[in-house]
């Protein structure tokens, strides 16, 4: 779950969460909340060249909520993201009886305050929703993160180019003859997503 305005969206955090999900065999879906506060084109453009589903929520019109419900149906879904991005607000919009506590963004820190302090599971729409506590940062070098040799596979849009590089074991960062970097240069891949890959590669 991501915000388009407050707190400022971090594509690196989103990409870390998405990569962890892919590595563990979980389908990530990017849900952009607070879409009624500003245009979501920044986030949309970052993911339009990826294979990740992207949903923009407009609480004024209700746009996007039905699509979220469809993803929940028949599944166990976890709402994850930074504090203040609107996870509890999204849950309240989907399940008014949930009455999850929400809070304003800290003007001093520019980020959300923790209002959800434990994981709570709700039965809804033929599936289950796990509302998880927010966080301020997500470090890629913690135990259980993606092994460096698996990281390229955690970016599904890299898939068509893997195994096509000039050198075996290509890291897709500085090597000549890299098919991933060539696809990036040709505009087939998102620069933002590629930058996240490089940042994560340096962390793990």
What are these regions (language model features)?
Residues 3, 19-28, 35, 50-53, ...:
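Helix-rich effector regions associated with P-loop NTPase G domains
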Residues 34-85:
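Canonical P-loop GTPase G-domain recognition
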Residues 79, 92-96, 102:
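Conserved ATP-binding TGD loop and adjacent catalytic N/P-domain core of P-type ATPases
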Residues 10-11, 41-42, 67, 92, ...:
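Short, well-ordered secondary-structure micro-motifs
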Residues 13-16:
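Charged helix-capping and loop-helix junction motifs
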Residues 1-11:
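N-terminal accessory targeting/assembly segments
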Residues 8, 38-39, 63, 136-139:
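Catalytic P-loop NTPase motifs of RecA-like helicase/translocase cores
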Residues 83, 88-89, 93:
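Walker A/P-loop
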């Amino acid at each position: 779950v991501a915000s388009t305005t407050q707190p400022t969206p971090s594509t690196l955090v989103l990409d870390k969460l998405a990569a962890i999900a892919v590595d563990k065999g979980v389908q990530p879906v990017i849900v952009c909340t607070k879409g009624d506060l500003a245009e979501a084109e920044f986030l949309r453009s970052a993911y339009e060249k990826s294979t990740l589903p992207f949903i923009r929520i407009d609480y004024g019109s209700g746009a996007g909520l039905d699509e979220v419900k469809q993803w929940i149906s028949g599944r166990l879904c976890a709402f994850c993201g930074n504090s203040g991005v609107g996870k509890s607000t999204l849950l309240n919009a989907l399940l008014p009886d949930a009455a999850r506590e929400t809070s304003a963004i800290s003007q001093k820190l520019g980020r959300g305050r923790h209002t959800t302090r434990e994981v709570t599971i709700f039965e809804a729409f033929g599936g289950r929703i796990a509302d998880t506590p927010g966080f301020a940062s997500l470090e890629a070098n913690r135990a259980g993160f993606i092994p460096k040799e698996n990281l390229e596979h955690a970016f599904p849009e890299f898939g068509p180019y893997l195994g096509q590089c000039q050198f075996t074991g290509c890291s897709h960062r500085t090597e000549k003859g890299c098919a991933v970097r060539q696809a990036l240069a040709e505009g087939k891949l998102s620069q933002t997503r590629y930058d996240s890959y490089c940042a994560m590669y340096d962390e793990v």
